[in-house]
Regions:
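Acidic, glycine-rich A-domain
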Residues: 1-91
Length: 91
């Protein structure tokens, strides 16, 4: 058995899968490492939007499967929630 670093595990997973991570923003945590390693696949969900987590995951799956991000956002009942969650991808 050889220990594997978290970053090495992430890289291995990225060879086979589209890897996403949703961070719930509560303040005080440095999330830049997730941005660095996942880029647009790091979703930041403000704590006030946590009740929308399932919808954010569903929207992520739709976009990963080819749906247009702007259409997915526009068709959601509260587009501002998805705009906040996908702000890395919308820059």
């Amino acid at each position: 058995y050889e220990p594997t670093s978290p970053l090495a595990c992430l890289k291995m997973a990225q060879h086979k899968f589209q890897v996403f991570h949703v961070s719930i923003e509560k303040g005080g945590y440095d999330l830049s490492g997730w941005d660095k390693h996942l880029g647009n696949n790091h979703l930041r969900l403000p704590a006030r939007d946590v009740s929308h987590l399932a919808e954010v995951v569903l929207a992520t799956m739709q976009i990963a499967n080819g749906a247009d991000i702007n259409e997915v956002i526009a068709n959601y009942k509260d587009p501002e929630v998805l705009k906040r969650a996908f702000r890395n991808a919308l820059r």
